[in-house]
Design a protein with these regions (language model features):
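Glycine- and other small-residue-rich loops at beta-strand/loop junctions that grip anionic moieties
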Residues: 1, 98, 120-123
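Glycine-rich ThDP/TPP pyrophosphate-binding loop and its adjacent helix/strand module
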Residues: 1-25
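Short glycine/serine/threonine-rich phosphate/pyrophosphate-binding segments
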Residues: 3-12, 38-40, 124-131
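Basic, gly/Ser/Thr/Pro-rich low-complexity segments located predominantly at protein N termini
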Residues: 8-11, 15, 54, 58, ...
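Alpha-helical scaffold segments in soluble metabolic enzymes
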Residues: 10, 14, 76, 107-111, ...
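Active-site/ligand-binding loops adjacent to catalytic centers
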Residues: 20-25, 30-118
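C-terminal structured "cap/appendage" subdomains that terminate the fold
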Residues: 113-142
Length: 142
């Protein structure tokens, strides 16, 4: 799941060096809520990291520090911008991003709970939904 980038960065950054240094072709896909699509619909520009405008201006994919996202169940994913490092990686095409509708994320979370016996957090359901999309693409294409 992707809110500001720490979760995504923590899991993907250790592996990205293989793509950069060794020419591997691993895909890194961030899954963000469609109601707060800073990576898929935001602009790469300098913006404040906080709503009040107290931080220095930072280069990021952003919806604008005044953006007020809809109230969604995954409250941790409502941040207006993406971290500086993640933003640069997306700008440099070293990663991808998809947006996930809330209902699709909940359906994926229910499927995961039924199959694995673990109830995921609403935020994590976005990443699960993206994984289900990828699995279905592979099923269709062979």
């Amino acid at each position: 799941c992707f809110g500001g980038g720490s979760n995504f960065g923590g899991i993907s950054f250790p592996f990205m060096r293989h793509n950069i240094l060794e020419g591997k072709k691993t895909r890194f896909v961030a899954a963000e809520p469609a109601s707060c699509p800073k990576l898929t619909r935001g602009k790469f520009q300098y913006d404040f990291g906080d709503e009040a405008g107290y931080t220095p201006l930072l280069p990021m994919f952003t919806l604008g520090h005044n953006f007020a996202p809809a109230h969604i169940h995954a409250g941790g994913l409502r941040y207006h911008g993406a971290g500086v490092i993640v933003s640069q990686l997306l700008k440099d095409n070293l990663m991808e991003a998809v947006d996930i509708q809330q209902l699709e994320s909940f359906e994926a979370g229910c499927l995961f709970a039924q199959m694995e016996g673990i109830i995921p957090a609403p935020e994590s359901c976005h990443a699960i939904a993206a994984a289900v999309r990828e699995a279905n693409k592979c099923k269709e294409t062979g």
